[in-house]
């Protein structure tokens, strides 16, 4: 069975659409969902990632959820390998794999079988040390001198990606973008659905989502994860919501002041997601508010299948 991918910005309703599609197909064929949200890989990071509780998954098997401890570093290469194995096993069982998420590099690495450039622990460690010495803003400036395009595409607060870009530039002698995947026929002939809303409507949804996260106990979740090493986690501690709560707690606050910067950071991230996904001509875009999205999604999938 060829897969279906449902991608797009945060807060657009991708998980709900995937479950609706799964229910519609359930009478005729099995369906299993493969997560493509990097932060939902982490055990215990539930509220801040809007991870669906098991009771709300409608009996549909889910993969690539809760596979990492918060002290482990998330890796696109690891995800690509493990998720591809999941997809091929699901298809071999005669079921439909539905890939769901909005983590840009994770989605594209999976669908385009991205071959990753070499890595060198010594070079990586040297740039990590440089980051610790000069700070993320200064290191972003250094990246801008050697690879302006990479600096323009990476947030000046994203130390992990800045370090990786500098590592790749040093090891390959080429711009970071030279290692990016080309956009050709998607792996496994996957049908790709993009879900989005008009900007002002999505902003309202994001505000409500952020309020709900704090009301449901995001601060308490962060406090609990601190006992499991969240602060030492290279990627987990930088996740939206979690990083902002940590910063407020470190400043002596009770975490509640993190609500606004979390919302602002999420809106900024949505702009990056749109810019990334909209350049992909293979995506069939749907309006999140349309009542016939299940039918349109299935038509697109059947046209491929």
Curated annotation (Swiss-Prot):
Cofactor(s) in the UniProt record: Mg(2+)
Nucleotide-binding is among the record's keywords: yes
A GO BP entry: tRNA modification
Swiss-Prot/TrEMBL keywords: ATP-binding, Magnesium, Nucleotide-binding, Transferase, tRNA processing
The enzyme's E.C. designation: 2.5.1.75
Superkingdom to which the source organism belongs: Bacteria
Disulfide bridge partners, by residue number: none
Site-annotated residues for Interaction with substrate tRNA: 103, 124
GO molecular-function term, one example from the UniProt record: ATP binding
Binding site for substrate: 10-15
Substrates-to-products reaction catalysed: adenosine(37) in tRNA + dimethylallyl diphosphate = N(6)-dimethylallyladenosine(37) in tRNA + diphosphate
InterPro entries: Dimethylallyltransferase, IPT, P-loop_NTPase
Binding site for ATP: 8-15
Function: Catalyzes the transfer of a dimethylallyl group onto the adenine at position 37 in tRNAs that read codons beginning with uridine, leading to the formation of N6-(dimethylallyl)adenosine (i(6)A).
Protein family (similarity comment): Belongs to the IPP transferase family.
Subunit structure: Monomer.
Annotated HAMAP family: IPP_trans
Protein name per UniProt: tRNA dimethylallyltransferase
Organism annotation: Mycobacterium sp. (strain KMS)
Highest classification ranks of the organism: Bacteria, Bacillati, Actinomycetota, Actinomycetes, Mycobacteriales
């Amino acid at each position: 069975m060829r897969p279906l991918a449902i991608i797009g910005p945060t807060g657009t309703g991708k998980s709900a659409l995937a479950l609706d599609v799964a229910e519609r197909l359930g009478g005729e064929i099995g369906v299993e969902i493969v997560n493509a949200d990097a932060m939902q890989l982490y055990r215990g990071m539930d509220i801040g990632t809007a991870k669906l509780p098991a009771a709300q998954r409608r009996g549909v098997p889910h993969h690539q959820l809760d596979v990492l401890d918060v002290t482990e570093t998330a890796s696109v290469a690891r995800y690509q390998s493990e998720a591809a194995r999941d997809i091929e096993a699901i298809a071999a069982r005669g079921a439909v794999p539905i890939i769901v998420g909005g983590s840009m590099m994770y989605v594209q690495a999976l669908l385009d079988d991205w071959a990753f450039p070499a890595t060198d622990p010594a070079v990586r460690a040297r740039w990590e040390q440089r980051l610790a010495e000069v700070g993320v803003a200064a290191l972003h400036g250094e990246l801008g001198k050697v690879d302006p395009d990479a600096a323009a595409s990476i947030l000046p607060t994203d130390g992990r990606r800045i370090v990786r870009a500098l590592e790749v530039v040093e090891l390959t002698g080429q711009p970071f973008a030279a290692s990016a995947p080309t956009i050709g026929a998607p792996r496994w002939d996957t049908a790709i659905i993009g879900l989005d809303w008009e900007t002002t409507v999505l902003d309202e949804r994001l505000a409500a989502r952020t309020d709900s996260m704090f009301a449901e106990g995001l601060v308490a979740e962060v406090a609990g994860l601190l006992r499991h090493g969240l602060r030492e986690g290279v990627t987990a501690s930088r996740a939206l919501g979690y990083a902002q709560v940590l910063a407020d707690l470190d400043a002596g606050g009770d975490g509640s002041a993190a609500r606004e910067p979390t919302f602002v950071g999420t809106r900024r991230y949505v702009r990056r997601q749109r810019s990334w996904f909209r350049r992909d001509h293979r995506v069939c875009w749907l309006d999140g508010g349309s009542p016939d999205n299940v039918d349109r999604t299935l038509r697109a999938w059947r046209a491929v299948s």
